[in-house]
Amino acid sequence: DAAKEKWEKLRAELAALEAEKPPPLPCAPSVTDVGPLAPEVSIPGRRNAEPIEPGGLSVLDPNPLPIVPNPSQQTTGRRTALAHWITSDTNPLPSRVLANRLWQHHFGRGLAESPSDFGRLGEPPSHPELLDYLASELLDRGWSLKHLHRQMVTSAAYRQASHGPEVTASAQKDPLNKFVARMTVRRLSAEQVRDAAVAITGELDTRMAGPGGDSGKTARRAVYLKVQRNSRDATLDVFDVPDGLASMPVRNITTTPTQSLFMINGPWMMLRAKALARRLESNSSATLDERVATAYRLAYGRVPRPDEAAAVRQFLQASDTGGNAALVDFCHVLLNSSEFLYVD
């Protein structure tokens, strides 16, 4: 009996330790290197066929791709050779394509309007010399994206106004703004709308790496959200997020009643308005005007104009609803404004 009792006790301890084990890491299909020597590849069905070596189109360059294996690594060196071949200084495409994509990201449209087609069927760049300059900067700076980002956002073109009499005259002459004579007003992307709404409430989880989750169940940034092609994310889908089934070099920008319903009546946006109101109320010593100024700073990055502050103060003081309902309504209005949704 003593031995049996000891056995049961050990089993219970073992079960307790098993319960403390972390869950197994998720698995995914992957590939591994075959070693420094790659298997020979030849055309099937041909006897005594010579092995085919990696290379470009033989009609353009009959020489095989130079491959220098690294004896210190268990790899053939073929992928490294391909990467060097693609990013070679003699290949003008990668630097131009990348510079054009960055320009499109900051200005709403690329210098070349067909970002995935730089061939004869694509649209020629509106400013070829500028595109060449940006591509050269990218190469000369060792492919530093940070340097190119800095050049674009500190340029005179990026710092132009998007409103005013001069802008109106420019819009009449150049409606599509191909000559970059003004800054184009653009709406935030689906991911930016979601992250901005979570960020101003103080809920955004800015941790790097790690597991993500569904949009409505996690406060992590949108870059970490789970993407399922057969199960669209309602929060992002309403603002034209790509479906993940096909490449989309230029996103569609639509204005639909569904977006208004989501922003005004959607439960997710109402939760963000309540969270923003709680954040404003967390500073119990702040005055009403200070809370209004904080709300404007969080939502718009500026302080309210005197007329705006007076209107909000009048609304909050005249409200006869109990609790913080009026403050929640005010926060809801901030989240539904064009100034919150658009970059101008």
Predicted regions and their residues:
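Globin-like tetrapyrrole-binding proteins
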Residues: 330
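A structural supersecondary motif
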Residues: 237-247
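Primarily short, surface-exposed interaction patches in extracytoplasmic proteins
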Residues: 1-219, 246-251, 264, 270-327, ...
